Amino acid sequence: MTEEKDEYGTIVVARVAMEENMFNPQPDIPRIRNDSTHSYQQPESMLEKLNTYYTLAVVIAQLTIGVLGNSLTLVADATRIFADHLELFQYDRAATPGKRLTEIITVGITNVILFLLFVAFLLTASGRAATMEFDINRLYLSIGTAMAMTANTLQTLCHFRTWQRERSYHSSLYTGSKRNQLMHGFVYHFIAYFVLVSSLLIIVNKDYLIADVITTYATSLLILANISSIGYQLYHEYFSLEHPQDEYEPI
């Protein structure tokens, strides 16, 4: 009888201890994930999704029209539009390290391809400038220029919409301050407009074929600006992946 009471008392004490641990856990356990290094990512709006689809459509159309019309400016500007859109890519910092690394590698490979295209545009434009033995279909050039100007306007609006959000990291480059962001918006896209308008000289008079070479050089420099910005973003994303802060905190 005494043994049964002792056993019953042990069970009661153990149950009370479990309840105390349940409602007053030790500071070491349990531990929950603290996403201090993974900033909240706002979901992509319908406008941004439509802009993405439209941008891809314009890039494909411009590449096709540029090749058919033999306009190096249209081909280079299609690449610039894609590079500028890629610069706005929102990395998912709430994803697993494996998925984040996949994003970084994919964007990095794309950035390398863009750099190779940048070099190809410079070499091709230099070859055209040396011989001037090329012709451009003015009808294709007119259609492609109109599409490019529309896409440039939408990208300007998307840039300003993105800059209103708080970035997941603080950079010291031009993307780091609102002032320099606005400078990028006005200067970059103003130059893009100027390049496209300059290409209209060819439509007026074919004697201005040299404008296709000059605008290709200018567009290539804009592509290089995008490549540099994307590379800087990749550096910060990879650094945050390799050197995370304390991701856990006690309840």
UniProtKB/Swiss-Prot annotation:
It is found in: Membrane. InterPro entries: Cation_efflux_TMD_sf. The keyword Transmembrane helix applies. The keyword Lipid metabolism does not apply. Keywords: Membrane, Transmembrane, Transmembrane helix. SUPFAM superfamilies: Cation efflux protein transmembrane domain-like. GO terms for cellular component: membrane. It is a multi-pass membrane protein. The chain crosses the membrane at residues 56-76, 104-124, 184-204, 208-228. Its main location: membrane. This is Uncharacterized protein F19C6.5. It comes from Caenorhabditis elegans.
